[in-house]
Amino acid sequence: MYKILAGVGSIVRTLFMVFTHGFRKRDTILYPEVPAEEIVPPRYRGRIILTRDPDGEERCVACNLCAVACPVGCISLQKAEKEDGRWYPEFFRINFSRCIFCGMCEEACPTTAIQLTPDFELGEYVRQDLVYEKENLLISGPGKYPDYNFYRVTGMAINGKEKGQAQKESAPIDVRSLLP
């Protein structure tokens, strides 16, 4: 008799759990029907882009800090120099099949050239199509920081003039003279 009551109790408990879980709000999101803005959190780190400064020039100065900071080594670039002495990446390549979207490259970039967007649809049929070149990564705008220009903040050497000799430029300060 005890086994019969235990069996009936087990069946009743199972039916109770099925009905309580059956009428709950579902956790599964039907992605194509639901807009991506409802799925992706506000600070989601997705596809990597290269931005331009407010003057329209590339922000990247090919310092290679992003490639060093990348834990999986999916960034490769080659430095070149313009006539005015400014560095730029001759090629900039990101392998998205290896990228873990950690954001370390964005944090390491001193010019805010690398930024992560909330784009997450990077599926391709061929793995080689996930290797993005500079032309695929470079956008026409400044991204998250519209007013920041690296060379306005840091300055750039002028050919034929020493530091402090250019117009509206103060002479460099000897920090050791300030010590007690």
Swiss-Prot record:
Record localization: Cell inner membrane
Requisite cofactors: [4Fe-4S] cluster
UniProt-listed Enzyme Commission number(s): 7.1.1.-
Principal cellular location given in the protein's record: membrane
Single annotated GO MF: 4 iron, 4 sulfur cluster binding
Superkingdom field: Bacteria
UniProt binding sites for [4Fe-4S] cluster 1: C60, C63, C66, C109
Cellular component GO terms, alphabetical: plasma membrane
Pfam families given in the database record: Fer4_7
Sequence ranges assigned to domain 4Fe-4S ferredoxin-type in this UniProt record: 50-80, 90-119
Signal peptide: none
Function: NDH-1 shuttles electrons from NADH, via FMN and iron-sulfur (Fe-S) centers, to quinones in the respiratory chain. The immediate electron acceptor for the enzyme in this species is believed to be ubiquinone. Couples the redox reaction to proton translocation (for every two electrons transferred, four hydrogen ions are translocated across the cytoplasmic membrane), and thus conserves the redox energy in a proton gradient.
UniProt record similarity statement: Belongs to the complex I 23 kDa subunit family.
NCBIfam families noted in UniProt: NuoI, PRK05888.1-1
Oligomeric and partner information: NDH-1 is composed of 14 different subunits. Subunits NuoA, H, J, K, L, M, N constitute the membrane sector of the complex.
Annotated protein name in UniProt: NADH-quinone oxidoreductase subunit I
Species in which this protein is naturally found: Acinetobacter baumannii (strain ATCC 17978 / DSM 105126 / CIP 53.77 / LMG 1025 / NCDC KC755 / 5377)
